[in-house]
C-alpha cells in the first residue's frame, strides 16, 4: 500500500497518483486508486472531484466500482476533514480503524493500492489523529508530493525531517510542471546538493515513475 500526501493542498497529489497508477497498470501491476476522505465536494452537481477522477481510472479495471466503493467520507465544506465533519455530520466522527480495514481489503484483489490523503501530513482528521497518523495506522509506504514553486526547498526539508523522525519508508517527489523553467536555476541546484548528502534523495516525479513503482512494490 502506498499513501500519497503532499507539502500542502494543490501540490498535485491527484495528478501524480493517476499518472503513477496508469504507469503501474501499463506495466502489468494491477493498481487501484482510493480517496477515503474528500472535502470541498458536491457530488450532486460536480463529477470532477478527485474521487470521481479516480473512479474513472479504476473502472478501466472493474466496471462495477462506484464512488462509494473508493471514497467513504465526503463533505461539502472545503476545509480540514475534522472541521467539515464537525459542521456537517457532528455525530459521526471519522473512524480511521474502519477505514484501515476497508482499505486493506483491496490488497486481496490488487497488486498495489494507492491511497490519497487530504491536504498535507498534519491535516486533522479527528481531534486525536492527522493524515500522518492515518498513514502510520495503515502501515503504508509514503510518497510525498511537493509543488515546484519558490519555497519548495523549505517545504521539502520540513516534511523530510518529520517523516524521518517517524522512521517511515518514504520518498519525496517534486511535481514539475513542463513550463516551470525557473525551477532549474532557483531550486534544482540545492536539491542536487541535498541529494549528494542524503541516503534518500528527492526526485522529480515525472522522471521517476519506474523508480517510484519499484519503491511502492518492494
Swiss-Prot record:
Subcellular location: Cytoplasm
Enzyme nomenclature, EC number: 6.3.3.3
Binding-site positions, substrate: 39
Gene3D superfamilies xref list: P-loop containing nucleotide triphosphate hydrolases (3.40.50.300)
MF GO annotations: ATP binding; dethiobiotin synthase activity; magnesium ion binding
Leading EC class: ligase
Residues noted as binding ATP in the record, renumbered to the chain: 10-15, 116-119, 176-177
Required cofactor names: Mg(2+)
Database matches in InterPro entries: DTB_synth_BioD, P-loop_NTPase
Origin: domain of life: Bacteria
Residues given in the record as Mg(2+) binding sites: 14, 116
One Gene Ontology biological process: biotin biosynthetic process
Pathway: Cofactor biosynthesis; biotin biosynthesis; biotin from 7,8-diaminononanoate: step 1/2
Protein's UniProt keywords contain Coiled coil: no
Subunit structure: Homodimer.
Function summary: Catalyzes a mechanistically unusual reaction, the ATP-dependent insertion of CO2 between the N7 and N8 nitrogen atoms of 7,8-diaminopelargonic acid (DAPA, also called 7,8-diammoniononanoate) to form a ureido ring.
Protein's recorded name: ATP-dependent dethiobiotin synthetase BioD
Organism: Helicobacter pylori (strain J99 / ATCC 700824) (Campylobacter pylori J99)
Protein encoded by which gene: bioD
Amino acid at each position: 500500500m502506498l499513501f500519497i500526501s503532499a507539502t500542502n493542498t494543490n501540490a498535485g497529489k491527484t495528478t501524480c497518483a493517476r499518472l503513477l497508477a496508469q504507469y503501474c497498470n501499463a506495466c502489468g501491476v494491477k493498481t487501484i486508486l482510493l480517496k477515503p476522505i474528500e472535502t470541498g465536494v458536491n457530488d450532486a452537481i460536480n463529477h470532477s472531484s478527485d474521487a470521481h477522477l479516480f473512479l474513472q481510472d479504476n473502472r478501466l479495471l472493474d466496471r462495477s466500482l462506484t464512488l462509494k466503493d473508493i471514497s467513504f467520507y465526503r463533505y461539502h465544506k472545503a476545509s480540514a476533514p475534522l472541521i467539515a465533519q464537525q459542521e456537517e455530520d457532528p455525530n459521526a466522527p471519522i473512524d480511521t480503524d474502519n477505514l484501515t480495514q476497508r482499505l486493506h481489503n483491496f490488497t486481496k484483489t490488487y497488486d498495489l493500492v494507492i491511497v490519497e490523503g487530504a491536504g498535507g501530513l498534519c491535516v486533522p482528521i479527528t481531534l486525536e489523529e492527522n493524515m500522518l497518523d492515518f498513514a502510520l495506522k495503515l502501515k503504508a509506504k509514503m510518497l510525498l508530493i511537493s509543488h515546484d514553486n519558490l519555497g519548495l526547498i523549505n517545504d521539502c526539508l520540513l516534511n523530510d525531517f518529520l517523516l524521518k523522525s517517524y522512521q517511515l519508508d518514504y520518498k519525496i517527489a517534486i511535481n514539475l510542471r513542463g513550463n516551470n523553467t525557473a525551477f532549474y536555476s532557483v531550486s534544482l541546484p540545492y536539491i542536487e546538493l541535498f541529494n549528494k548528502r542524503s541516503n534518500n534523495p528527492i526526485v522529480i516525479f515525472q522522471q521517476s515513475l519506474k523508480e517510484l513503482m519499484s519503491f511502492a512494490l518492494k
